[in-house]
Amino acid sequence: VGGVDPAGIVRDVGMGVADISAGDRVALLSRVPCLSCEHCDAGNFKKCPNSVMLGVGRWGGAAELVKVPASVAVKLPRNLEFPEAAAVLRHGPMAHHLLFDIGGLKAGETVLVMGAAGGLGLTGIQIAKAAGAKVIAAAGSDERVAVGCEYGADFGVNYVKQELTEVVRTYTGGRGVDLVFENISNPKTWPKALKCLRKFGTLVTAGAHGGGKVELDCAFLYHQNIRIFGSTGSTDQNVSDTVALASEGKLKAKIEKIFPLSEIPAAHRMMEGEVLSGKIVLDPTAG
């Protein structure tokens, strides 16, 4: 059974579960720990080297019921609806981790968000803006740039039509950006994004769907004292901060369409056949 990032109401809990109760409204984190390694024994579930993705490595949430360890359940405030919660927790914790824990982004700094209309990109834009940063949204079409700006970016650039590095450096007065939030790894755009950085700037990345293998100008890297970090993780604090931002209305998901569970084939056809900027949600209560 597939289905990542479920959210719903707890039906029952096992013996020894203290923090979650039947009737609680929760969303589920996507990585399920093994519960038997040294990290899990110490309660550091997010460091589990054997974790699997819900709906990929074990049965997921495209069903009326799903059984998971209590460690992946996140309590939700009453004002956060299930579709919204499921979508924001998909990318919010990782974006928060990349921007602040790794990227060190501060209020007043400038961040370039690549793939700005995708799930991680739109999330990064909103979280950075909520922290007081200036955001440049970069995407591969005017329509997708517009989506990034709609969700809070201060400026947009179409990296297919425009020369990315030149436009960004002009916008920043020749200085460059403090942080590049990269989640594409396209061999055509990645080197240009890197050269948008100011001296002592940082590039963070968590994506490779654009190819994965890119060219690196090592002379630029060391002359400009650039830092490059990749990460797939997050912390419990990142999760809490994501829920808080969503509850306050500062982080919103772009939901393309909600399908009843009975129409899951149509949902998959939509996902496979269109270039989407929003999420597709399945609702088991709708039929």
Regions found by a protein language model. Give the residues of each.
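Glycine-rich beta-strand-centered segment in the early N-terminal region that forms part
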Residues: 1-41, 57-60, 77-79
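Hydrophobic beta-strand signal
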Residues: 27-28, 112, 204
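NAD(P)H dinucleotide-binding glycine-rich loop of Rossmann-like/cofactor-binding domains
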Residues: 32-115, 150
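Mid-domain Rossmann-like dinucleotide-binding core that forms the NAD(H)/NADP(H) cofactor-binding site
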Residues: 81-162, 166
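Glycine-rich cofactor phosphate-binding loops and adjacent beta1-alpha1 units
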Residues: 136, 146-227
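C-terminal hydrophobic helical "lid"/dimerization subdomain
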Residues: 191-194, 236-287
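Rossmann-fold dehydrogenase core element
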Residues: 201-206, 215-255
